[in-house]
A protein has these predicted regions:
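Hinge/cleft segment of the Venus flytrap/periplasmic-binding protein
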Residues: 32, 170-173, 178, 283-334
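Short, solvent-exposed amphipathic alpha-helices that sit
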Residues: 47-62, 144-151, 177-197, 212, ...
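Flexible loop/hinge segments that line or gate small-molecule binding clefts
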Residues: 105-143, 265-277, 320-321
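Structural motif
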Residues: 66-90, 203-224, 240-243, 267-268
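Venus flytrap/periplasmic-binding-protein-like
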Residues: 117-127, 233-280
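Extracytoplasmic "Venus flytrap"
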Residues: 33-54, 58, 62, 67-79, ...
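Periplasmic-binding protein-like
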Residues: 37-38, 89-97, 115-119, 169-170, ...
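Hydrophobic alpha-helical segments within soluble ligand-binding/sensing domains
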Residues: 30, 77, 135-165, 213-214, ...
């Protein structure tokens, strides 16, 4: 039932966004207001709703109209570009449902002379390589990873752990560039802080979700029965949560495990539990910055001919824990 409700919510949001855009296309406005699109793959997610909200704030500040559209798949993405062109839009920001759609999206946009900026996910070309010629606003993977490692070490010191009987469980997905850079950044920060390099153990996950990370973590834990304290590193909240679930299954108390995720939104239920778990906190990125900065750059490109940087890394993150998560999420409209 929960799954059905979520699907209905997605359909409703997608339908509303498309109807709104279609109305612009067929009826237009009475004025000559500049129109720019903002296309997202998962409109039901708080992250993208916040991006939309802050894109609209930029629109109010600079005097342009934001046409919000849901693009959950390739067909809807290409249709949305047709609709934007018909509405008179001059360009769009997009978080694509599939990075491999990059060449098709750019070909369609070029046919209408629309400018494009990508946000959150980078386009890939036919060979699977990043399309670095398309402007991108994205979370800074290596720096976020470094912050994860720094915060883990800081909390470990606060708890007075002995490094001699402590270890790092680094759940990896090295085939994904962002995941690899986050985990590598975290490990580098831990080593720099003084954590013993030979007690950092990498284990690959087959899937980037809780069950996949749980399986990976279990396979690692049984190899090191003498470790008393675990630091858990992963590319996002769910991989870290999988590691936490594994330590619980192996009998570790919450005070002997520290996991810090990345994303924040997926960590809320864990942080809201009545009793603390090994999941200490999460690094909450800035969808507000992504939404405002990406469409602001597009506006200046269209209006003033100021070509945007090809790659803007956003480093703004805040560590949310059981103590502050409600206040920090509220600040970002999540």
């Amino acid at each position: 039932m929960k799954t059905i409700r979520k699907k209905l919510a997605v359909a409703a949001l997608a339908g509303t966004a498309l109807l709104s855009a279609s109305a612009h296309a067929f009826f237009g406005n009475d004025d000559d207001t500049l129109k720019l699109g903002y296309l997202v793959k998962q409109p039901e997610e708080p992250w993208f709703q916040t991006e939309w909200n802050f894109a609209e704030k930029a629109g109010k500040e600079y005097g342009f109209e934001v046409i919000k559209m849901a693009v959950p798949d390739g067909e809807k993405t290409l249709n949305a570009i047709d609709t934007l062109a018909a509405s008179g839009a001059k360009g769009f920001v997009i978080c694509t449902p599939d990075p491999k759609l990059g060449p098709a999206i750019m070909a369609k946009a070029k046919s209408y002379d629309l400018k494009v900026i990508t946000v959150d996910d980078q386009f890939l070309n036919a060979k699977g390589k990043p399309m670095t010629n398309v402007p991108l606003v994205m979370m800074a993977a290596s720096q976020i990873g470094q912050r994860q490692g720094q915060e883990l070490y800081k909390e470990m010191q606060k708890r007075g752990w002995n490094p001699a009987n402590s270890a790092v469980m680094a759940i990896t997905a090295d085939e994904l560039d962002t995941a690899r850079r986050r985990v590598d950044g975290s490990i580098a920060a831990l080593k720099e802080a003084g954590f013993p390099a030979n007690q950092i153990y990498r284990v690959p996950t087959k899937t980037n979700d809780i069950p996949g990370a749980l399986d990976a973590a279990n396979s690692l834990l049984v190899q090191y029965p003498n470790v008393k304290h675990w630091l858990v590193v992963g590319m996002n909240d769910n991989t870290v949560l999988g590691g936490i679930r594994a330590t619980e299954g192996q009998g570790f108390d919450a005070q002997n495990v520290i996991g810090i995720g990345i994303n924040g939104v997926d960590a809320v239920n864990e942080l809201a539990k009545s009793k603390p778990t090994g999941f200490y906190g999460s690094l909450l990125p800035s969808p507000d910055v992504h939404g405002f900065k990406s469409i602001e750059s597009l506006y200046k490109w269209v209006k003033d001919g100021v070509e945007p940087k090809k790659f803007v890394e956003v480093t703004d993150v805040v560590l949310i824990t059981r103590e502050n998560y409600k206040a920090e999420l509220k600040k970002k409209g999540l």
